[in-house]
Amino acid sequence: MQLTAVGLNHQTAPLSIREKLAFAAAALPEAVRNLARSNAATEAVILSTCNRTELYCVGDSEEIIRWLADYHSLPIEEIRPYLYTLDMQETVRHAFRVACGLDSMVLGEPQILGQIKDAVRAAQEQESMGAKLNALFQKTFSVAKEVRTDTAVGENSVSMASASVKLAEQIFPDIGDLNVLFIGAGEMIELVATYFAAKNPRLMTVANRTLARAQELCDKLGVNAEPCLLSDLPAILHDYDVVVSSTASQLPIVGKGMVERALKQRQSMPLFMLDLAVPRDIEAEVGDLNDAYLYTVDDMVNIVQSGKEARQKAAAAAETLVSEKVAEFVRQQQGRQSVPLIKALRDEGEKARKQVLENAMKQLAKGATAEEVLERLSVQLTNKLLHSPTQTLNKAGEEDKDLVHAVAQIYHLDK
């Protein structure tokens, strides 16, 4: 089985498809273990973020697609148009580019590297990685570090978190006059909340499934921040001007009815809602309501493109470095795959040498001259070593040009 990757991202699939194929963080360890023990793959890493779901495997790409469809209980033909399947070399290049932020919605964004490390850690804990994927991701992390150190690809990038504040500022003139509600307390919400906190909003509230985690984030923010439970949302939603949500829930947390009731109490005051979750936390129908301004990760594209032109110059240098590293890695892997063949070839050569030497010793014992024995030995050794290649070439003829070219290369006859 060969190294391969199957996936979809923000470039190939809309949010409505991506959310159907996302893996919840809590379910991912079991999923990657299941995949690596299925008929589809022998090694597996699953990367699932708001912008991509990718399965890096040693396996059969068609069976991996089938597994993905079955896991999410979807018809295979519904998802196939949005998927890409990559061969060994394409998989290596793709992994390097993703880790370097070259394939991200935000060119050069650093968060993806941490997400890949989390995915690899989960696979390692489930013993779902073997020699091939371990080698791939060790090199991936090394290349990502080198690209980010030696190029300016990540400089001045507008992150999804900072873009959230920019978007709110397009609707409200002063963040300092606003009440801001964060739904969830994970990494994305922590990043977004940090940017909002720098603008000193009037009030910040973190709603989470557990109060302790919400309080922990409030303590980090160190401003007017207070915790609450998700169950409090229907009663408090109307008090907030800005709502940012990013949880791991597989079902919407905020429905159209809840927002309708909040808007009535707000008396035509606008409600800015940013849903950064995949699957979505806020029902899409909320966007149809007057005075509700609902944005999703796909709506952030234009905002995060700010400064992209300057970063694209750095990206060109990064792409060159990635290409060099891909070629280097592929050569190393092909060299390792050739080790058993090289050993077998040398064993055959040694076997031929011993046979010819044994015959030569017998000839010397019978009184043949050294000159005669050496002449016969050299002819026999030449015949033995070239018999198989010559026979194979005669059978192949001119039709198998790849074989003819390979033999010419091996014996340096193509000069």
Swiss-Prot record:
A Gene Ontology molecular function term of the record: glutamyl-tRNA reductase activity
User: What highest taxon heads this organism's lineage?
Assistant: Bacteria
Q: Name one GO biological process term.
A: protoporphyrinogen IX biosynthetic process from glutamate
- What's in the misc comment field? During catalysis, the active site Cys acts as a nucleophile attacking the alpha-carbonyl group of tRNA-bound glutamate with the formation of a thioester intermediate between enzyme and glutamate, and the concomitant release of tRNA(Glu). The thioester intermediate is finally reduced by direct hydride transfer from NADPH, to form the product GSA.
The UniProt entry's sequence similarity note says: Belongs to the glutamyl-tRNA reductase family.
Q: How does it assemble?
A: Homodimer.
> Which protein, by its recorded name, is this?
Glutamyl-tRNA reductase
This chain is encoded by the gene named hemA
